[in-house]
From Swiss-Prot:
Biological role: Plays an essential role in the initiation and regulation of chromosomal replication. ATP-DnaA binds to the origin of replication (oriC) to initiate formation of the DNA replication initiation complex once per cell cycle. Binds the DnaA box (a 9 base pair repeat at the origin) and separates the double-stranded (ds)DNA. Forms a right-handed helical filament on oriC DNA; dsDNA binds to the exterior of the filament while single-stranded (ss)DNA is stabiized in the filament's interior. Strand separation requires the DnaA boxes and adjacent DnaA-trio motifs, but works equally well with ADP or ATP.
Gene: dnaA
GO-annotated biological processes: DNA replication initiation; regulation of DNA replication
The organism's taxonomic lineage, starting at the top: Bacteria, Bacillati, Cyanobacteriota, Cyanophyceae, Synechococcales
Name the record gives this protein: Chromosomal replication initiator protein DnaA
Family recorded in the similarity comment: Belongs to the DnaA family.
Length: 482
């Protein structure tokens, strides 16, 4: 057996021996990854295991590196035993597993204690692979979760890595770490996607789990209804029975003193019971105006995970994944063109992709950059649209008649279509508010103003409304060019 030559206290390993050790390490880690991939759920494997790197193995000690301390701590706490057991099965004997942080390995300390702390494996953690069906799923608090908002469809980048990892962490082990989890970021950056992905994941593991996903507005409306019906006890029992509660747009609780009061006690009850709380906002707790100090304190006591706008590479990956899932094949130059021009949020980015495909389909043109560039970079001046053209397009979209739009029907679908028509006429014509009112059967200018404000707000807060308005605009754009 060849031995390394000792020079100045350092053992020099022959080149051939070093290659053999490296190949042995690589082969071992590949086998471990292959087995863990079948044991763990896909989001768990890709977030915690696949991102780790095997650094060294001397036959007794396997050293791994993770991309950040967050991932290292999670592996140490929940998956150390699992990895060590799989390695022992492959090798036929037990090993010691040590985990460090990849960014630290460039400068190894004098003592390995800080970088590679000796870790005693924690008690065995049962690895649960989520079942493939969710039969018997209980109804959610407000409405069914969006089936597209799952972890496998979330594109991870530098802008959202921490938020994604934290969301998966609490989906795996709710109520243990990061409680509450406070997701913070601008409109359309993926907060709602992550919240609903948590709900999907928990329901796959436990179909009987009580998962509540509500907006702050829904919570407030339920509270008001309970006060009117004198049923506050039922309201409290309902919300405090949640296993996981996720509240979107929590910033809208500002200034609502009684809602804040009730949410404070609901929060305390759930937190003390070890139930998971997830909140989402467009700003951190300390920047929400007219928010009680005790709520700022509660909201900040867990983990605040910030989400930033995606970089170019992440935007390209988002578009590629969406086109793949939606079966909308796009040329690479089209994807890069969209990614370069829509930089603020994911909602606009995906909307541009949908708009490009819809435009090509409606116009009958090939999906090339030359053909779709006009709709992706629309002219700054208003489209040449007549009131009749807008009325006709809105009527067809909402499956109502122009007479309905000009009439006084209060049916929900007619009222909404009428409000959308007024909004679009304000956007795309030079008509005054009274003149727009005349186009809709002589409606008062205050009615037009209210409709424009309401649809404008819905466009920002309701993704479905934003998508519907964009589709109508696409049709109007094509019509204006005809």
């Amino acid at each position: 057996m060849r031995r390394g030559k000792k020079v100045g206290g350092i053992v020099l390993i022959p080149y051939s021996a070093a290659i053999a050790v490296e190949q042995s390490l690589e082969h071992l880690w590949e086998q471990i990854l292959e087995r863990l991939q079948h044991q763990l759920s896909r989001p768990t494997f890709e977030t915690w295991i696949k991102t780790a790197t095997a650094e060294a193995f001397d036959g007794k000690v396997l050293r791994l590196s993770t991309p950040n301390p967050f991932a290292r701590n999670w592996l140490q706490k929940y998956y150390l035993r699992t990895i060590a057991d799989v390695a022992a099965e492959i090798l036929g004997h037990g090993i010691e597993l040590q985990i460090g942080v990849l960014s630290d390995t460039s400068a190894e300390p004098e003592s390995g204690a800080e970088l590679w702390p000796a870790i005693s494996p924690p008690p065995a953690v049962e690895v649960v692979k989520p079942p493939t069906t969710t039969a018997g799923r209980p109804p959610l608090r407000s409405s069914d979760l969006n089936p597209k908002y799952v972890f496998s469809r979330f594109v991870v980048g530098a802008n959202n890595r921490m938020a994604h990892a934290a969301s998966l962490a609490i989906a795996e082990y709710p109520g243990r770490e990061y409680n509450p989890l406070f997701l913070c970021g601008g409109v359309g950056l993926g907060k709602t996607h992550l919240m609903q992905a948590i709900g999907h994941y928990r329901l796959e593991i436990d179909p009987d789990a009580k998962i509540f996903y509500v907006s702050t507005e829904q919570f407030t409306n339920d509270l008001i209804a309970a006060i009117r019906r004198d049923s506050m006890q039922s309201f409290r029992e309902h919300y405090r029975a949640a296993d996981v509660i996720m509240v979107d747009d929590i910033q809208f609780i500002e200034g609502k003193e009684y809602t804040q009061e009730e949410f404070f006690y609901t929060f305390n009850s759930l937190h003390e019971a070890g139930k998971q709380i997830v909140l989402a906002s467009d700003r951190p707790p300390s920047q929400i105006p007219r928010l009680q100090e005790r709520l700022i304190s509660r909201f900040s006591m867990g983990l605040i995970a910030d989400i930033q706008p995606p970089d170019f590479e992440t935007r390209v990956a988002i578009l590629q994944k969406k086109s793949e899932f939606e079966n909308m094949p796009l040329p690479r130059d089209v994807i890069e063109y969209i990614a370069a021009r829509y930089t603020s949020n994911i909602r606009e980015l995906e909307g541009a992709l949908t708009r490009a495909v819809a435009y090509a389909s409606i116009s009958g043109l090939a999906l090339t950059l030359a053909n779709i560039a006009p709709v992706l970079t629309p002219p700054t001046e208003k489209m040449e649209l007549s009131p009749e053209m807008i009325l006709q397009t809105v009527a067809e979209t909402f499956d109502v008649s122009i007479e309905d739009l000009r009439g006084n029907s209060r049916r929900r679908e007619v009222s909404l279509a009428r409000q959308v028509g007024m909004y679009l006429m304000r956007q795309h014509t030079d008509l005054s508010l009274p003149k727009i009112g005349e186009q809709f059967g002589g409606k008062d200018h205050t009615t037009v103003m209210y409709s424009c404000e309401k649809i404008g707000q819905l466009r920002q807060s309701d993704p479905q409304m934003g998508k519907q308005l964009q589709e109508i605009n696409d049709q109007l754009f094509v019509a204006s060019r005809g």
